[in-house]
Amino acid sequence: PLLAHFIAKFPQVNLSVLNGNSRGVEVALQEHRIELGLVEGIFRLPNLKYTLFLQDELVAVVHVNSKLNIQEEITPAELPNIPLVLRERGSGTLDVFERALSQHNLKLSSLNVLMYLGGTESIKLFLEHTDCMGIVSIRSVHKELVAGTLRVVEIKGIPMLREFNFVKLQGQE
């Protein structure tokens, strides 16, 4: 709805939307293939200017019909025993999750990652048909939480907060 409102308010603006992970967006800016990007995560390249757009939280979710015996809250020590589906390398989502793990001396390599996928919608579909847990934005699963098809699993002591930033080349108006 955000883009639809933008186009309604500014019909004279020619807008093309490309989808990619945060690192890909930063590379596209540096190569002058795009003028403005929206990135997640913790990247900070000195030749790019980042402007905060919104704050977000990542959460662990499972499908309500999953056969995983997971309580509403788990400890970080339980994570290696749980099959996971995660975003792909280069995504801000994965970087934020890895940083949160490192605060508990956990590494991604110690976890049972079944699959890395290129987008949140793919993760949600995968969760419908598998017994595993995914890490996604709380904003991206609002409908599923309201509908009761997914449920949040709290990972005790691992807050996964992140920012979305508009990003452009330094010195660009």
Model-identified regions with their sequence ranges:
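Hydrophobic hinge/microswitch elements
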Residues: 21-26, 30-34, 39-40, 102, ...
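Short beta-strand->loop
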Residues: 49-59, 112, 145-161
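Residues at or immediately flanking beta-strands
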Residues: 12-16, 112-114, 163-165
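Flexible hinge/capping segments at coil-to-helix
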Residues: 48-85, 89, 169
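Secondary-structure junction motif
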Residues: 83-105
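Central regulatory/effector-binding core of bacterial HTH transcription factors
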Residues: 1-46
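A late-sequence structural motif
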Residues: 122, 153-173
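Well-formed, non-transmembrane alpha-helical positions, independent of function
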Residues: 5, 27-28, 52, 75-78, ...
